[in-house]
C-alpha cells in the first residue's frame, strides 16, 4: 500500500522556510532531518596552496577560514568528488572578503560576498589557490548545506473555558506552528484550519486567546520542519535532494533484500 503524504509551506524563502508534512512517523521525520544535514552534498574548500602570506595569521588559520566559506552548488552539473579551483589575491591595507575569491567555474562561487577572511595592514599581502571539493556533511561538517534543520509537532489549541477573575494571567508560551481550531475566540481575523506561526502573537497564547483557558495538543503524524541553508542552494532544493537520498537508499535496501 502506498502511503500518501501532504506537504505544505508555512513560510517559504530562499534560505529559510517552514514546511508542514502530514502522514509521517517521528522516525521518518528524524530521517528527513538527518538527510538534510548529512546527505546533501555541497562544495567546500578542502586544499589550500599558500603562495604568499605576510599577514599576522598562520597559513593553517587562513585555510580553516576559507574552508568555512559557503559556496554555491549546482547538484545537476556536478558529482561527489568533483573539484573546482579558486584563487584569492589581496594587498593591504584592505580586508579580504569572500567576494575576493575568484572561481574557475562561475557556477561555484561564494554564497555571500561580505564574509571577512582577514584584515590586512599596510605592506601585507595574501595570495592563495584553493581546491573546493563536492562532498557531504557525513564526511565533514563544512559540507552541511542545511545549517539549521529541526522539526516539531504541529499543534492544536482548544479553548476549554474562560479565565476566572482571580486566575493567574502569566504568559502562556508556545513556540512553533498551530493549526487554528478556535477561530471564534482568537484575537483579530482568524479562520479555522489556517496555519499560524506562534511568533505572530509573540509566542504567547494569552495574546492569541485573551481571557481564555486553553489546552494544547499535538496533531498526530504532522510535523513542521524549520529549514535554514548556508546559501549553497535554496531550501526547496535541500528538501527535495534529502528526500531523494532517502528514496535511493530505500530502493537499494529493497533490491538487496530481494537478491
From Swiss-Prot:
The gene is rpo3. PANTHER family: DNA-DIRECTED RNA POLYMERASE, DNA-DIRECTED RNA POLYMERASE II SUBUNIT RPB3. It catalyses: RNA(n) + a ribonucleoside 5'-triphosphate = RNA(n+1) + diphosphate. Coiled coil: none annotated. The keyword Manganese does not apply. GO terms for molecular function: DNA binding; DNA-directed RNA polymerase activity; protein dimerization activity. One of its GO terms (cellular component) is cytoplasm. SMART domains: RPOLD. It holds the Pfam family RNA_pol_A_bac. This is DNA-directed RNA polymerase subunit Rpo3. GO terms for biological process: DNA-templated transcription. Keywords: Cytoplasm, DNA-directed RNA polymerase, Nucleotidyltransferase, Transcription, Transferase. It comes from Haloarcula marismortui (strain ATCC 43049 / DSM 3752 / JCM 8966 / VKM B-1809). Its EC number is 2.7.7.6. SUPFAM superfamilies: Insert subdomain of RNA polymerase alpha subunit, RBP11-like subunits of RNA polymerase. InterPro entries: DNA-dir_RNA_pol_30-40kDasu_CS, DNA-dir_RNA_pol_insert, DNA-dir_RNA_pol_RpoA/D/Rpb3, RBP11-like, RNAP_Rpo3/Rpb3/RPAC1, RNApol_insert_sf, Rpo3/RPB3_RNA_Pol_subunit. Part of the RNA polymerase complex. The keyword Cytoplasm applies. It is found in: Cytoplasm.
Amino acid at each position: 500500500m502506498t502511503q500518501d503524504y501532504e506537504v505544505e509551506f508555512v513560510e517559504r524563502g530562499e534560505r529559510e522556510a517552514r514546511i508542514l508534512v502530514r502522514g509521517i512517523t517521528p522516525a521518518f521525520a528524524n530521517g528527513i532531518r538527518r538527510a538534510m544535514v548529512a546527505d546533501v552534498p555541497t562544495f567546500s574548500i578542502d586544499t589550500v596552496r599558500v603562495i604568499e602570506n605576510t599577514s599576522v595569521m598562520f597559513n593553517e588559520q587562513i585555510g580553516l577560514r576559507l574552508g568555512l566559506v559557503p559556496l554555491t552548488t549546482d547538484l545537476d552539473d556536478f558529482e561527489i568528488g568533483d573539484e573546482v579551483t579558486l584563487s584569492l589575491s589581496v594587498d593591504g591595507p584592505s580586508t579580504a572578503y569572500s567576494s575576493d575569491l575568484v572561481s574557475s567555474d562561475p557556477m561555484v562561487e561564494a554564497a555571500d560576498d561580505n564574509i571577512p577572511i582577514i584584515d590586512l595592514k599596510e605592506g601585507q599581502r595574501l595570495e592563495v589557490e584553493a581546491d573546493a571539493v563536492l562532498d557531504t556533511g557525513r564526511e565533514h561538517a563544512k559540507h552541511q548545506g542545511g545549517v539549521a534543520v529541526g522539526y516539531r509537532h504541529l499543534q492544536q489549541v482548544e479553548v476549554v473555558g474562560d479565565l476566572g477573575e482571580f486566575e493567574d494571567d502569566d504568559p502562556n508560551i508556545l513556540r512553533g506552528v498551530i493549526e487554528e481550531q478556535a477561530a471564534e475566540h482568537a484575537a483579530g481575523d482568524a479562520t479555522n484550519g489556517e496555519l499560524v506561526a506562534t511568533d505572530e502573537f509573540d509566542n504567547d497564547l494569552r495574546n492569541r486567546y485573551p481571557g481564555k483557558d486553553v489546552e494544547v495538543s499535538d496533531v498526530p503524524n504532522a510535523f513542521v520542519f524549520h529549514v535554514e541553508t548556508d546559501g549553497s542552494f535554496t531550501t526547496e532544493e535541500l528538501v527535495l535532494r534529502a528526500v531523494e537520498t532517502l528514496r535511493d537508499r530505500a530502493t537499494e535496501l529493497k533490491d538487496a533484500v530481494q537478491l
